[in-house]
């Protein structure tokens, strides 16, 4: 049986941890002037992928 391929786009965006998959939050790329400093600071924090999305991410990262 051939090796399963890793989805490289997913591999660059998510990291496997003991608690699930770590990801970066959205809304911090552009149009930042109207967002408050507090909002931007909170968006810098990493967060975990939602429980319902974990199986899909795990399928795309077979060796994670």
UniProtKB/Swiss-Prot annotation:
The keyword Transport does not apply. PANTHER family: 54S RIBOSOMAL PROTEIN BL35M (PTHR33343), LARGE RIBOSOMAL SUBUNIT PROTEIN BL35M (PTHR33343:SF1). This is Large ribosomal subunit protein bL35. Keywords: Ribonucleoprotein, Ribosomal protein. Gene3D superfamilies: 4.10.410.60. PROSITE patterns: RIBOSOMAL_L35. It holds the Pfam family Ribosomal_L35p. GO terms for molecular function: structural constituent of ribosome. The keyword DNA-binding does not apply. GO terms for cellular component: cytosolic large ribosomal subunit. Belongs to the bacterial ribosomal protein bL35 family. GO terms for biological process: translation.
